[in-house]
Amino acid sequence: MPVKFPSLKFEQLKQLVLVAAIAVFCVSCSHVPDLAFNPWQEIALETDSTFADIAFTEDPNHGWLVGTKETIFETTDGGDTWEQKLIDLGEEKASFSAVSFSGNEGWITGKPSILLHTTDGGQTWARIPLSEKLPGAPYSIIALGPQTAEMITDLGAIYKTTNGGKNWKALVEGAVGVARTIQRSTDGRYVAVSARGNFYSTWAPGQTEWTPHNRNSSRRLQTMGYGKDGQLWLLARGGQLQFSTDPDAEEWSDVIAPQDKGSWGLLDLSFRTPEEVWVAGASGNLLMSQDGGQTWAKDTGVEDIPANLYRVVFLSPEKGFVLGQDGILLKYNPSTEVAMVP
């Protein structure tokens, strides 16, 4: 006896086939090419800290790496191996946020109210006392020359010293408020993203106040920074990237989505060369563009790293590092050819 299938089930089957076809089409559209070679070497460090910053002395092989949980590492071979160091801060539980060197003079900032100074490449570190009235906690510092540095707090208060930290001059009258991220350009400008990512502020030398700017889309801002030529860039929630098209930070390029998968969070961006861009993100996500951000490729050699990659730092086109959580550190290997596989 012939079996009759209800028409409803047949319609359901057609819908399932259609959904499957759409899914396959979307996957093919959102595919990001892979890099043929992985130019990053994972450096094994025995710590579960999240790294915040890295800097080198006048000796290109001698560097320092800092992070949470009072973490400080030193290298004397260009970053291939690292030795953990301890600095006695008493009973305070510090979280280091930045390190910077000019020659052999260096500075380290951290919470709560931590500022360290060295004049001998880090053989000895002295703690610089900070006023209890300091607006916010030290967020970052830039060594500018002998006895000279510029420090910014997490509330956007900017100070400069020219005598090794004995005295500080305020460069801005008003704070910006609690900031999510703050970055400085090579010519001394700053951009700060608000704690909730709903607006950003800019400051330039000579200005007395921060200038607030509304974000240009419904997506909350993740972080912002400056490219090699001083051009602003931004990363927004959902894995979106934009570059500024005017010096006033009011006009922006069309949205670029390095990955057409909104679930991937992008956390930092850095230029290796004027055209080669690297973007790091959650769950070992590392992407590269060779044409200034127009097309992208994914470094699948690091995608199995079970950690967020928070910072990409290129000290030169040949020397770069990726800083992550749980003690993850990647070192750029320029001898590895970088090529895209379609």
Curated annotation (Swiss-Prot):
Q: What is the effect of changing R219E?
A: No visible phenotype
Superkingdom? Bacteria
Give residues with lipid attachment (N-palmitoyl cysteine): C29
Can you list the GO cellular component terms from the UniProt entry? photosystem II; plasma membrane-derived thylakoid membrane; thylakoid lumen
For this protein, the record's InterPro entries field holds: PSII_CF48-like_dom, WD40/YVTN_repeat-like_dom_sf, Ycf48/Hcf136
The stretch of residues making up the signal peptide is: 1-28
Which segment of this protein is annotated as the motif Arg-rich patch? 196-220
> Pfam families annotated for this entry?
PSII_BNR (PF14870)
Lipid positions (S-diacylglycerol cysteine): C29
Keywords in alphabetical order, please: Lipoprotein, Membrane, Palmitate, Photosynthesis, Photosystem II, Signal, Thylakoid
Q: Which GO terms describe its biological process?
A: photosystem II assembly
Phenotype upon knockout is: Grows significantly slower than wild-type, 30-50% reduction in functional PSII, decreased chlorophyll content, significantly reduced replacement of photodamaged D1 (psbA). Grows poorly on low light (40-50 umol photon/m(2)/s) and not on higher light, reduced chlorophyll, increased levels of unassembled D1, substantially reduced levels of chlorophyll precursors.
According to its UniProt entry, what is the function of this protein?
A factor required for optimal assembly of photosystem II (PSII) which acts in the early stages of PSII assembly. Also plays a role in replacement of photodamaged D1 (psbA). May interact with precursor D1 to prevent its premature processing before association with D2 (psbD). May also play a role in chlorophyll insertion into chlorophyll-binding proteins. Increasing levels of chlorophyll precursors partially suppresses deletion of this protein, supporting the idea that Ycf48 assists YidC in synthesis of chlorophyll-binding proteins.
Subunit field text: Part of early PSII assembly complexes which includes D1 (psbA) and PsbI; not found in mature PSII. By two-hybrid analysis in yeast interacts with precursor and intermediate forms of D1, but less with mature D1. Binds to the lumenal side of PSI and PSII complexes. Coimmunoprecipitates with YidC. Purified chlorophyll- and carotenoid-containing photosystem II (PSII) assembly intermediate complex RCII* (iD1, D1, D2, PsbE, PsbF, PsbI, Ycf39, Ycf48, HliC and HliD).
Per the record, the similarity remark reads: Belongs to the Ycf48 family.
Comment on protein domains: Eukaryotic orthologs often have inserts compared to cyanobacteria; insertion of a 19-residue sequence from C.merolae into the same position in this protein (at Val-176) has no visible effect on function. An Arg-rich patch composed of 4 residues on the 'top surface' of blades 4 and 5 is important for binding to assembling PSII centers; mutating each Arg residue individually has no phenotype whereas none of the triple mutants grow in high light (90-130 umol photon/m(2)/s), suggesting more than one residue is involved in binding to the lumenal side of assembling PSII centers.
Q: What is this protein called?
A: Photosystem II assembly lipoprotein Ycf48
The coding gene here is ycf48
